[in-house]
Amino acid sequence: MTRIRRGYIARRRRTKIRLFASSFRGAHSRLTRTITQQKIRALVSSHRDRDRQKRNFRRLWITRINAVIREGGVSYSYSRLIHDLYKKQLLLNRKILAQIAISNKNCLYMISNEIIKEVDWKESTGII
C-alpha cells in the first residue's frame, strides 16, 4: 500500500490555529500542541468572564450609587432608594443611576429628594 501525502491540509489547519495564538507568549504561540491547549483555555476564560463582567459592573454601579447617596447627608441608603423607585414605578435602572451619579450628583440628589417627599406624603396620608 502506498503512502498518501496529505498535502497542505494539516498545514492549513495548524496555521489557522497559529493565527489565533499569534499574540501569545513563548511556546504558547509556537508549538502546535500548546497552542491548541491555550486556545481552549482562552475560549473557556472568555466565556466565563463574560458572565462575571455583568456581575462586576452591577456591583460597581451599586457601589457608585450608594456612595453618592450616602454623601448627600440625608440618612438615606441605596436599598431605600431602589425600593422607593420601584414603589413609584420609575424606569431608572442601576446603570443609568450610576451614570447620573458620576456626571451630575445634584441631579441624583433631586431625584432622591423627590422620591422621599412623595413616598413620605403618600405614607402619611394613608394612600399606600
Curated annotation (Swiss-Prot):
Instruction: Alphabetically list the UniProt keywords.
Output: Chloroplast, Plastid, Ribonucleoprotein, Ribosomal protein, RNA-binding, rRNA-binding
Q: Which InterPro entries match?
A: Ribosomal_bL20, RIBOSOMAL_L20_CS, Ribosomal_protein_bL20_C
Q: Specify the species.
A: Panax ginseng
First-listed, main subcellular location of the protein, grouped into a coarse class = plastid
What Gene3D superfamilies does the entry give?
Answer: 6.10.160.10, Ribosomal protein L20
Question: What Pfam families is this protein classified in?
Answer: Ribosomal_L20
Could you tell me which NCBIfam families the record lists for this protein? Answer: rplT_bact (TIGR01032)
Protein's name in the database: Large ribosomal subunit protein bL20c
Q: Please describe what this protein does.
A: Binds directly to 23S ribosomal RNA and is necessary for the in vitro assembly process of the 50S ribosomal subunit. It is not involved in the protein synthesizing functions of that subunit.
List where in the cell it is found.
Plastid, Chloroplast
**UniProt record, GO biological process:** ribosomal large subunit assembly; translation
The record's listing under SUPFAM superfamilies reads:
Ribosomal protein L20 (SSF74731)
Family per record: Belongs to the bacterial ribosomal protein bL20 family.
What is an example of a GO molecular function annotated in this UniProt entry? structural constituent of ribosome
Residues annotated as coiled-coil are none
Give a GO cellular-component term: ribosome
